[in-house]
């Protein structure tokens, strides 16, 4: 059992949903990113999604696009991202880290070198936004050889054939994009999310996390009543963007602690062990 599977197994036994934050590696700088990762774990997160900065992040809204731009101004490379994970691993061996990004930097490095370096750094999963599951058999094979979980996105418009394909390939968890469009959008329909999760669970037997559009404690709690994990990105990245350097860790920590409390306050009747 790897770190991701271990975390979800423990949470299931406790009837708790996972809290998964997203931050961009190198925003505002590499040293602060590692400090942020540790502050997030202190605030109660269960897994960290670490974005690989990219010049054309097509699935991301303006907030996360700007975070990529800030990181790229510091010339943050894929090698730097691995170094941040390795630095984090020096003192944290338990919190899973999932890299989230786009295909170009991976293909420039090559599948084999990427997964070997990721494995040595302590990466637990990789989500590549623009890899169609129908075309990544070789990619998934390389990941699994290093015991790295391939994470996939599903959306409200994903056809049944692709859902079945993701069910075959995915390991660790599946990330359900709860809105059409880009990250940070609003107008989340919680009833629609619940219906879709019920449908997805007829195909998928690993945990399902829900992200995109979760911006406050009430929505996080409601999602936690239905999903195995709550993924929050844009709201946290906004806090990073607008916080003075001296207050950044404290502000992000306070935000995440409030989200953790909200998620743990989910209704008792909505057991993830019953799903």
From Swiss-Prot:
Concerning SUPFAM superfamilies, the annotation shows: Ribulose-phoshate binding barrel
Q: Which Gene3D superfamilies match?
A: Aldolase class I (3.20.20.70)
Residue ranges that the Swiss-Prot or TrEMBL entry lists as coiled coil: none
Q: Which reaction does it catalyse?
A: (1S,2R)-1-C-(indol-3-yl)glycerol 3-phosphate + L-serine = D-glyceraldehyde 3-phosphate + L-tryptophan + H2O
According to the UniProt entry, what is the EC number of this protein? 4.2.1.20
User: Mind listing the UniProt keywords for this protein, alphabetically?
Assistant: Amino-acid biosynthesis, Aromatic amino acid biosynthesis, Lyase, Tryptophan biosynthesis
> Which InterPro entries does this UniProt record tie to the protein?
Aldolase_TIM, RibuloseP-bd_barrel, Trp_synthase_alpha_AS, Trp_synthase_suA
Instruction: List the Gene Ontology MF annotations in alphabetical order.
Output: tryptophan synthase activity
Q: In which pathway does it act?
A: Amino-acid biosynthesis; L-tryptophan biosynthesis; L-tryptophan from chorismate: step 5/5
Question: GO cellular-component terms in the record?
Answer: cytosol
The annotated active site, in chain numbering, is 49, 60
Spell out the Pfam families in the cross-references. Answer: Trp_syntA (PF00290)
Functional summary from the UniProt entry: The alpha subunit is responsible for the aldol cleavage of indoleglycerol phosphate to indole and glyceraldehyde 3-phosphate.
How it assembles, according to the record, is: Tetramer of two alpha and two beta chains.
What the record says about family reads: Belongs to the TrpA family.
- What is the name of the protein in this document? Tryptophan synthase alpha chain
Q: What is the lineage of its organism?
A: Bacteria, Pseudomonadati, Pseudomonadota, Betaproteobacteria, Nitrosomonadales
């Amino acid at each position: 059992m790897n770190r991701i599977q271990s975390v979800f197994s423990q949470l299931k036994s406790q009837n708790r949903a996972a809290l998964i934050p997203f931050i961009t590696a190198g925003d505002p700088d590499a040293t602060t990113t590692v400090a942020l990762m540790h502050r997030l774990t202190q605030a109660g997160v269960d897994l960290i999604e670490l974005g690989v900065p990219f010049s054309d992040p097509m699935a991301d809204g303006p907030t996360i696009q700007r975070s990529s731009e800030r990181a790229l101004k510091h010339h943050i490379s894929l090698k730097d991202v691995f170094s941040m994970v390795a630095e984090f691993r020096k003192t944290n061996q338990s919190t899973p880290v999932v890299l989230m990004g786009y295909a170009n930097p991976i293909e420039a490095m090559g599948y084999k070198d990427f997964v070997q370096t990721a494995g040595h750094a302590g990466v637990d999963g990789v989500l590549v936004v623009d890899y169609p599951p129908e075309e990544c058999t070789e990619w998934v094979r390389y990941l699994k050889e290093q015991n790295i979980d391939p994470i996939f996105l599903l959306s409200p418009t994903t056809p049944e054939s692709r859902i079945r394909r993701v069910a075959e390939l995915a390991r660790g968890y599946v990330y359900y994009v709860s809105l059409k469009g880009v990250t940070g959008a609003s107008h989340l329909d919680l009833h629609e999310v619940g219906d879709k999760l019920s449908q997805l669970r007829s195909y998928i037997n690993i945990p399902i996390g829900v992200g995109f559009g979760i911006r406050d404690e009430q929505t996080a709690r409601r999602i936690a009543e239905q999903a195995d994990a709550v993924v929050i990105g844009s709201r946290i990245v906004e806090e990073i963007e607008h916080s003075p350097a001296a207050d950044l860790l404290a502000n992000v920590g306070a935000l995440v602690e409030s989200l953790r409390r909200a998620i743990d306050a989910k209704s008792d009747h909505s057991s993830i062990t019953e799903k």
